[in-house]
Amino acid sequence: RLRNLDTRVDLDALLEPARSVGGDYYDAMKIGDDRLGFAIADVTGKGVPAALYMAMSKALTSAALSRMQVDPAGMSEAINAELLKDNSEAMSVTMLLGILDLKTGEVRLVCAGHEDPIVVDCDGDQRRIKLEGGPPFSIVEFPYPLERLALKPGETLVLVTDGVTEAQNA
């Protein structure tokens, strides 16, 4: 269970790296009184180089969220620009970056080459949310489109990395 950021929402996460060091990560933080910022990402590669690049991308994401920015598209372009500056290992980062409005249930999302989110309704029915998105970070400058979805009370937003889909296909 993630730290209790707000009583209006439950956050849970599971991270089981295939190796002792990996490139997947997630983060969530409160933005003001009524917003929750979140990210889930996967760095290409494995081992120490991926873990170091993951740490850098996580730091950039956390810094953007902690500055209480509420524009995922602008944050994505800034994170991508920073990652493009120092990428001697030619790595890339897939990411879903979003802001949840805790009052309205509106989720504003940006997808950088990441797995599409899934919404599970109160009856357990699932629907995959197809996002336009763009390429993974640190490949090319790109104007990442802002996408929106509305969560109803009791619905669950499920975010995964490709580790889940790879495990399902194994």
Per-range role (PLM):
Residues 1-158:
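… and, occasionally, acidic/histidine-rich disordered N-termini of signaling adaptors
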